[in-house]
From Swiss-Prot:
Residues covered by the EGF-like domain: 330-370
Gene label: nas-29
Residue numbers covered by the propeptide annotation in the UniProt entry: 23-134
Pfam families in the record: Astacin, CUB
Species whose genome carries this gene: Caenorhabditis elegans
Disulfide bonds: 179-334, 201-222, 338-358, 360-369, 380-408, 435-456
Gene Ontology MF term list: metalloendopeptidase activity; zinc ion binding
Highest classification ranks of the organism: Eukaryota, Metazoa, Ecdysozoa, Nematoda, Chromadorea
Protein name, UniProt field: Zinc metalloproteinase nas-29
Length: 532
């Protein structure tokens, strides 16, 4: 068992030492076709295909042309890495057992009928189906499908050192962010076996005592924390975000750009197998499809965000979001380990490994999420006050020959009863799906828990967004490349629309720690003032 104070380096040393024991390394040859038989699953996939066709039979191709981006590199995704196994994997990367898939198919069919009944004003089991929105990520066998006694795991000898490190980072992340215990396998009959001898990145979903050994594949191209944390989340019991039964409230599905025999991958999971714990749909979840997943026209998305400002947020491979972490904590009943709950603010929740403090949404810090999160440098980040007159903000984060993650966190505040308008003037960055390497994230909603509007593509220039409330946390981040953004901001009354008036403030520059910031009030606050 891992000490709660164990750092990743200490954890790595502990596991590597355990790896020297023979029982921790497997040389058994295992491939996906040894686990699943296409002949058994194809009939069920066909049923789901018909279900999707029926549900979206009247749909028209729907997407905003402004969401077609000129990506700097060919988009990658777990689904694309698993193209070889499209005929056997569910939703691109889940090795679902016949029994589990049968339950999903039956639940999906019954739920579709229930929705039709609801439209006629009927009730389901004596209750309105509207209640399903308040349910959680679990199936009929819960809690038998979670690893209540901890997760034993072992490596296959085929795993590369890079793959092992990426897996251990994911294990350590889910240990640190939840109450789940992990330990290298000794003689446990139920355990996770990570393999690297097969193609692709795929996993089973949840604990299945009937399988005993459950396989997680981290093949060539999958050796990235965003991928390993995603696959391990499946093994711990989490489905894809876009499988939620309430997804149509957040994204539009375009079936006309998906090959007919792949439509089953867009079936929604019913409340019998999936629950949401009342948490919001998170387009920025690491468990969400990329916009163009399974599209036969690469430039046209299969999934389009209803709020088009969230389109670039979809498909990130950075790692689990705050909502992903919150769902996992709820799924494993972690907060029950604390006799009292911490007074968390801004959407935070009690940290089960230290019940006196909170886990905080991105952009917030402090014991109770009452403060702004810290930035990578003392020369960036802080509070900005919005005024009726327009102010301008410019920032450039540069990477040296040795790249490292750099994030500057700001909160824009306006008086009570006002809203904040941000006019993005220019973005200079590498444009990729999900904007997870370098970009700007604006949290314009009152609910700070989901990932906000992310922008990293030059096409986002001249875009205006308006907040729901009087505070906007925003993050400017660079992980691999230089990033630069310029925008103007001001406040308006809650009933006002966009205002195009411009009134530039003095331009000030701070070039310490590779950060260049322009904002009069900010630089006066940190006591660094130099006329450009």
């Amino acid at each position: 068992m891992i000490s709660k104070n164990t750092s990743f380096c200490g954890f790595l040393i502990l596991v590597l030492a355990t790896c020297m024991s023979a029982q921790f390394v497997s040389n058994e040859s295992i491939k996906l076709h040894d686990i699943l038989k296409p002949s058994a699953t194809h009939r069920l996939f066909d049923t789901l295909q018909y279900s999707v066709e029926e549900q979206y039979s009247d749909s028209h191709l729907s997407f905003d042309v402004s969401t077609i981006y000129n990506y700097s590199e060919k988009p990658i995704s777990i689904g694309k890495l698993n193209k070889k196994y499209r005929d056997i994997l569910f939703e691109g990367d889940m090795a679902i057992s016949y029994k589990q898939l049968s339950m999903i198919v039956n639940g999906s069919t019954e739920y579709r009928k229930a929705i039709k009944s609801r439209r006629r004003g009927n009730k389901i089991n004596g209750e309105s189906t509207d209640r399903t929105k308040r349910q959680a990520y679990l199936d009929n066998n819960y809690p038998a499908t979670i690893w209540k006694n901890g997760v034993a795991f072992m490596f296959h000898e085929s795993l590369t050192p890079i793959a092992k490190t990426a897996i251990l980072k994911a294990v350590h992340f889910w240990y640190r962010e939840t109450c789940i215990e992990f330990h290298p396998r000794t003689f446990q009959k139920e355990y996770l076996l990570f393999i690297g001898n097969d193609d692709g990145c795929w996993s089973t979903v949840g604990r299945d005592a009937s399988q005993g050994k459950q396989v997680v594949s981290i093949g060539n191209g999958c050796e990235h924390f965003g991928v390993t944390s995603h696959e391990l989340a499946h093994a711990l019991g989490i489905f894809h975000e876009q499988s939620r039964f309430d997804r149509d409230e957040s994204v539009v599905f375009n079936p006309r750009v998906v090959e007919r025999d792949l439509l089953f991958n867009f079936a929604k999971i019913s409340p019998r197998q999936m629950s949401t714990y009342g948490l919001p749909y998170d387009i920025g979840s690491v468990m969400h499809y990329t916009p163009t997943e399974f599209s036969n026209i690469p430039s046209i998305p299969t999934l389009a965000a209803i709020d088009t400002n969230l389109q670039q947020t979809m498909g990130q491979l950075e790692g689990p979001s705050f909502v992903d972490v919150h769902i996992m904590n709820q799924h494993y009943q972690c907060q029950e380990k604390c006799p009292t709950q911490a007074p968390c603010q801004n959407g935070g929740f009690t940290n089960s490994r230290n019940c006196k403090v909170c886990k905080c949404p991105t952009g917030f810090g402090g014991a109770y999420c009452q403060l702004i999160a810290s930035s990578f440098s003392p020369f960036c980040g802080g509070y900005l006050n919005a005024e009726e007159t327009t102010r301008r903000f410019d920032i450039t984060i540069r990477q040296s020959t040795t790249t490292r993650s750099k994030t500057c966190v700001y909160h824009i505040k306006a008086p009570e009863g006002k809203r904040i308008i941000i006019d993005i003037l220019k973005i200079d960055s590498k444009c990729i799906e999900g904007c997870w390497q370098d970009g700007l994230e604006l949290k314009m909603k009152k609910d700070f828990r989901p990932v906000g509007y992310r922008f990293c593509c030059p096409e986002s220039s001249r875009r205006k967004v308006i907040s729901e409330g009087n505070m906007v946390p925003f993050m400017v981040f660079s992980k691999e490349h230089d990033f630069s953004v310029s925008f103007e901001y001001s406040f308006v009354s809650t009933s006002a629309g966009f205002d195009d008036e411009k009134n530039d403030s003095d331009v000030i520059v701070d070039n310490l720690d590779g950060v260049f910031v322009s904002d009069t009030s900010l630089l006066q606050r940190i006591g660094f003032r130099r006329q450009l």
